[in-house]
């Protein structure tokens, strides 16, 4: 999950043709075959291309500007792209890049920055990236780095970072400030925090406690989470499990009852089921709340465009009215239902998750570039005159046509592929990668697009978000590489669980 506001500053590949319908629970196709291996190598080349451009033009800054070959420091100048790339480089077994990143992390001083720090973004990218690297290099990738001190450093740096950040939780309620000044221990004066921003800390901070033996970090994040699990006032929960979008920092009470799975709310729901995967015994209440939210979403938020009743999207809800719009960010939802369905052995969740995946696939399949837009809608009373044909054919119209290298659609395709074994979903992943490689690739990396439904993407944004490395490249590669401990598994066989930045953590 990332906040919804836009931060703007290979060789010829053939598209695979997807089948029209997906069989349910077909036996998984063999992962290791010549085509998959060839594609995996192409994906690794794309990752290395982006890394080489970042290393040449932007390192040690946060991100590359891949059109001008400049750089940006949107994440405090600690080298966000490097830290975010670590777990993907490990999974690709690229020891050269892994060691370059470890050398970088060792010299980062997380106590120094002149800019406001986002507790949320810093947790999911930096803390998540380092903890995941530690789990992977201490576990299934233990032979990749010979110097164990380099690996141990990841945990040391993780603890140092959390110690810099933890004052954010020092509020009357324990609900943290998000935008903080680590030099003065100040904040932006906000009176409330967002649902996802508050509810997407618990996995990383709990994992840190488990690895260090210091329970302070888990207690801080779980105290904040407690207000989200037992929402007050009752009016902030219009349907069981579905809660408002903002929480008072003073009292821990919700300040509204606006419900959605969109950006700003999304990863709260994502982490409910993932905490259960992390430890089913300790986090049974989180599972119960996810199930309540899932059931309510199926009953009250599921929406079908008038021109494409075969498609399913999740609407938002506020004050008795449904909002018939959604976002690229929201398209993680299919993966969440699929994960919950397989872990809880519930075919209804799996079927609904696949319906959501199909809807989000249409947002890619129907555009000129084959890439989905930042935001879209299906309100039949608000269709722009110049998009009526699109709405008639595809069941949605575009509100913002930007693409800033987001991963959520591919992420849900990955869950669909791993959980059903149906080859179609891997083809959808490949098609998306081919389109991104065609329209976003520059001489030094990958750039965002201004309009996915315009010729050549309507121009490029001169920015390469760090989550290109952490998420897009990882999910595409995982779908084309062999089975491994870190892969999503059917049923209760998961040895790892992914944070919202696609960094895999070892489960308890």
UniProtKB/Swiss-Prot annotation:
EC assignment: 3.2.1.113
Annotated Gene Ontology cellular component terms: cytoplasmic vesicle lumen; endoplasmic reticulum; membrane
An MF annotation (GO) of this entry: calcium ion binding
Stored Gene3D superfamilies: 1.50.10.10
Official protein name in the record: Probable mannosyl-oligosaccharide alpha-1,2-mannosidase 1B
Organism: Aspergillus terreus (strain NIH 2624 / FGSC A1156)
Residue positions of the active site: 374
Sugar-bearing residue positions: 94, 114, 365
Coiled coil regions in record: none
UniProt remark on cofactor binding: Ca(2+). Can also use Mg(2+), but with lower efficiency.
Pfam families (alphabetical): Glyco_hydro_47 (PF01532)
Keywords, sorted A to Z: Carbohydrate metabolism, Cytoplasmic vesicle, Disulfide bond, Glycoprotein, Glycosidase, Hydrolase, Metal-binding, Signal
Leader peptide range in chain numbering: 1-21
InterPro entries: 6hp_glycosidase-like_sf (IPR012341), Glyco_hydro_47 (IPR001382), Glycosyl_Hydrolase_47 (IPR050749), Seven-hairpin_glycosidases (IPR036026)
GO annotation terms (biological process): carbohydrate metabolic process; ERAD pathway; protein glycosylation
Pathway of action: Protein modification; protein glycosylation
Family: Belongs to the glycosyl hydrolase 47 family.
Compartments reported by the entry: Cytoplasmic vesicle lumen
Catalytic activity field: N(4)-(alpha-D-Man-(1->2)-alpha-D-Man-(1->2)-alpha-D-Man-(1->3)-[alpha-D-Man-(1->2)-alpha-D-Man-(1->3)-[alpha-D-Man-(1->2)-alpha-D-Man-(1->6)]-alpha-D-Man-(1->6)]-beta-D-Man-(1->4)-beta-D-GlcNAc-(1->4)-beta-D-GlcNAc)-L-asparaginyl-[protein] (N-glucan mannose isomer 9A1,2,3B1,2,3) + 4 H2O = N(4)-(alpha-D-Man-(1->3)-[alpha-D-Man-(1->3)-[alpha-D-Man-(1->6)]-alpha-D-Man-(1->6)]-beta-D-Man-(1->4)-beta-D-GlcNAc-(1->4)-beta-D-GlcNAc)-L-asparaginyl-[protein] (N-glucan mannose isomer 5A1,2) + 4 beta-D-mannose; N(4)-(alpha-D-Man-(1->2)-alpha-D-Man-(1->2)-alpha-D-Man-(1->3)-[alpha-D-Man-(1->3)-[alpha-D-Man-(1->2)-alpha-D-Man-(1->6)]-alpha-D-Man-(1->6)]-beta-D-Man-(1->4)-beta-D-GlcNAc-(1->4)-beta-D-GlcNAc)-L-asparaginyl-[protein] (N-glucan mannose isomer 8A1,2,3B1,3) + 3 H2O = N(4)-(alpha-D-Man-(1->3)-[alpha-D-Man-(1->3)-[alpha-D-Man-(1->6)]-alpha-D-Man-(1->6)]-beta-D-Man-(1->4)-beta-D-GlcNAc-(1->4)-beta-D-GlcNAc)-L-asparaginyl-[protein] (N-glucan mannose isomer 5A1,2) + 3 beta-D-mannose
Main location: cytoplasm
Positions of disulphide bridges: 331-360
Record gene name: mns1B
Subunit structure: Monomer.
């Amino acid at each position: 999950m990332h906040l919804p506001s836009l931060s703007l500053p290979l060789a010829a590949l053939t598209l695979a043709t997807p089948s029209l319908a997906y069989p349910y629970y077909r036996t998984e196709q063999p992962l290791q075959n010549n085509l998959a291996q060839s594609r995996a190598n192409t994906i690794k080349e794309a990752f290395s291309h982006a890394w080489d451009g970042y290393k040449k033009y932007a390192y040690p800054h946060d991100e590359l500007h891949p059109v001008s070959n400049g750089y940006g420091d949107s994440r405090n100048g600690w080298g966000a792209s490097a830290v975010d790339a670590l777990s993907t480089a490990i999974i690709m077994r690229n020891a050269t890049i892994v060691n370059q990143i470890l050398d970088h992390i060792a010299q980062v001083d997380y106590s120094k920055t002149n800019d406001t720090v986002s507790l949320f973004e810093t947790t999911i990218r930096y803390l998540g990236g380092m903890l995941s690297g530690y789990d992977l290099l201490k576990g299934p990738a233990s032979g990749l780095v010979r110097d164990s001190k380099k690996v141990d450093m990841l945990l040391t740096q993780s603890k140092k970072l959390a110690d810099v950040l933890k004052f954010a939780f020092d509020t009357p309620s324990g609900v943290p400030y998000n935008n903080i000044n680590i030099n003065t221990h100040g904040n932006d004066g906000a009176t409330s925090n967002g649902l996802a921003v508050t509810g997407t800390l618990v996995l990383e901070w709990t994992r840190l406690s488990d690895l260090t033996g210091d329970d302070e970090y888990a207690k801080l994040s779980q105290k904040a989470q407690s207000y989200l699990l037992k929402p007050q006032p009752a009016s902030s929960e219009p349907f069981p499990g579905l809660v408002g979008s903002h929480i008072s920092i003073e009292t821990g009470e919700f300040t509204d009852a606006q419900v959605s799975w969109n950006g700003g709310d999304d990863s709260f729901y994502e982490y409910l089921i993932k905490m259960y995967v992390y430890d089913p015994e300790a986090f049974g209440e989180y599972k119960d709340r996810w199930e309540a939210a899932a059931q309510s979403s199926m009953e009250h938020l599921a929406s079908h465009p008038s021109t494409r009743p075969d498609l399913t999207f999740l609407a938002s809800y506020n004050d008795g009215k449904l909002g018939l719009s959604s976002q690229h960010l929201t398209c993680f939802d299919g993966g969440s239902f699929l994960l919950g369905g397989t872990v809880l052995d519930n075919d209804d969740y799996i079927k609904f998750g696949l319906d959501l995946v199909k809807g989000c696939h249409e947002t890619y399949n129907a555009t000129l570039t084959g890439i989905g837009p930042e935001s879209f809608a299906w309100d039949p009373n608000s269709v722009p005159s110049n998009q009526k044909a699109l709405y008639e054919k595809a069941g949605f119209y575009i509100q913002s046509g930007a693409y800033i290298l987001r991963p959520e659609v591919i992420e849900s395709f990955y869950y669909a592929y791993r959980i059903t074994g149906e080859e179609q979903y891997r083809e959808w992943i490949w098609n998306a990668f081919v389109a991104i490689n065609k329209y976003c690739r520059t001489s030094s990396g990958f750039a965002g697009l201004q309009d996915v439904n315009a010729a050549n993407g309507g121009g490029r944004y001169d920015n390469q978000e760090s989550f290109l490395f952490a998420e897009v490249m990882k999910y595409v590669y995982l779908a084309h590489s062999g089975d491994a401990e870190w892969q999503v598994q059917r049923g209760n066989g998961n040895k790892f669980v992914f944070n919202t930045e696609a960094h895999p953590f070892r489960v308890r």
